[in-house]
Amino acid sequence: MAILFGPPATAEEVTPAAVWHPGPGSLASVRAGCADLGGKELGDCFAAAMAKAGASRAAVGFAQRFEGIAYIDALDRDVARPVAIAHVFFPYRANENSAWFLVNGMPELIDVDDRRYLAVDALERAPGYRALLRRYPELTLWPGLRGSTGPQPVSRSHGGERFTIGYRLRDLCHACAVVGHVRFAFDFDRSGKFLSTRLVSMTPVR
């Protein structure tokens, strides 16, 4: 399985004010101006360049939660529901630049590609997965498409909401063949408290 990493903790509500839409050429200019730096210097440089390029204080504040190396480019929010979907862009990643985060619940930020939140044990017990693993011994789990259309929340029968997210099974590497598709459901209670993640389906590519 590929190991997927999550964000640092935070306690601030994410609102539309935290969204940043760089103007034409702005992002390329910001990236180029900080590209020779690393670590904290890179983060500080990128956050400062965001502010100079017109990003709001909330947008810069969100970037600083990720040590200045990510920003929100869209927020799917229903005021009637506690949990929103933040579309987060990582400009310095080589791959998987776009990510989805479930925000404003408890915990406040959940990276849907963070392995700690995924029902990996249930996936590995699934007969279809075990059969696929016999065919592809180097099978790894990767994020699915994290595009501009985020997952739509569905009300749970006992209250709260569910977000169903798609993933890909690959024959080892990021550029290797997709050999299966997985869906996990993230469940929250009425207050936005994260309950658990469930395996919804595992489908091999035929």
Model feature map: region roles:
Residues 94-98, 149, 177-184:
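Short, surface-exposed coil-to-beta transition loops
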Residues 1-4:
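Bacterial N-terminal signal peptides
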Residues 169-170, 197-206:
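Short, solvent-exposed aromatic-acidic interface loops
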Residues 9-11:
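Boundary at the C-terminal end of the N-terminal hydrophobic targeting segment
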Residues 14-145:
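Extended, low-hydrophobicity segments enriched in charged/polar residues
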Residues 40-41, 50-52, 155, 179-183:
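Secreted/processed peptides and extracellular or luminal domains of membrane proteins
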Residues 189-191:
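Short acidic-glycine loop/turn motifs at beta-strand connectors
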Residues 129-179:
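Acidic, glycine-rich flexible loop segments
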